[in-house]
């Protein structure tokens, strides 16, 4: 009888090991790969944050909205950047502009608005390759990080929809439209640019508050 129980126990233990081994292997693999994944996500978000901020600043500058507050935000973004892009020279220029008097800064804002090259044709959709690639497997990440990355991905999708509108309105400004319709297209383009600037700014703030990396 004792031999029978021993055999049954061994069978059960063998079955459990067969069932649990893949799960245990997966857990070990995740623990091994997670630091590399964290590093990749940090780099991806850092570059996205920088691009979003500079795009928002550029769009506002083109509308004559360059001021000390905007430059201070630019300085903070550049000085806290931890990505691969070297922003030392831009940070130096930003600090130089912050040393200007209010009158000189106002003159600079007017000059930049008048001479800013139209940005519509160069305004491209934003992307976060690592996040996009991970969407199907986000369940493997800590719950809090899942939520934060999904929120960023959703906000990025909405932002890119607005970029499409801006690209459309930009193309319209070059078409042979009646004067009134051309004015409407330009107004819509400006409105779209400001929407993008606002959405990009909020997304930078969202990235800054990612707390699970």
Write out the residue ranges for each language-model feature.
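Membrane-embedded hydrophobic alpha-helical segments
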Residues: 1-31
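Interfacial alpha-helical end/capping and short helix-turn segments at domain and membrane boundaries
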Residues: 43, 47-213
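Juxtamembrane membrane-water interface segments immediately C-terminal to a transmembrane helix
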Residues: 28-49
